[in-house]
Amino acid sequence: MEYKIEYTTIEPIVEEEVSREAAQAYSEDGASMYDGIRMISRDESKKKRIMSDVLVSVRILCNRLIDHATLSDPTDGEEAITLTITLEMSERRRQGKGESLKTLFRSLTVNLFLNKFFASKNQVDLASKYDAAALADVQTIAKLLYEKLPPTYPTIV
């Protein structure tokens, strides 16, 4: 069974320098957060800053999960649950810093089978580049989401 989180942002999409590539990356169904970040920026410092900004938003999203998440039943026989969540701008942006930055994603899908995801070669490479505690925030949101799923669904392994 597959679980997906679908994020719908208020703002159209990203920062001017990478908006075209980002739009192209996210026009394809199923692009993951990490694949998208690799696609939209080859510059390591910019990529790390974008990653950090996304994780700030994810942290805020965790705090507001109950208010913003809506569960929908599987449709057309697909064994999946989609959580549609409004992804707000980070506190940093709301305080007037980084005004030129727009919300990074129009939509993105994250695979919740994170133990397997994190064990993949690409994820190991990313873990060496990005702060381990920040990556743990992604695990945290998966745990919070899983706790809201009906008890009849299987555990994440």
Regions from the language model: what does each represent?
Residues M1-G98, T140-V157:
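Conserved short "hinge" loops at termini or chain/domain junctions
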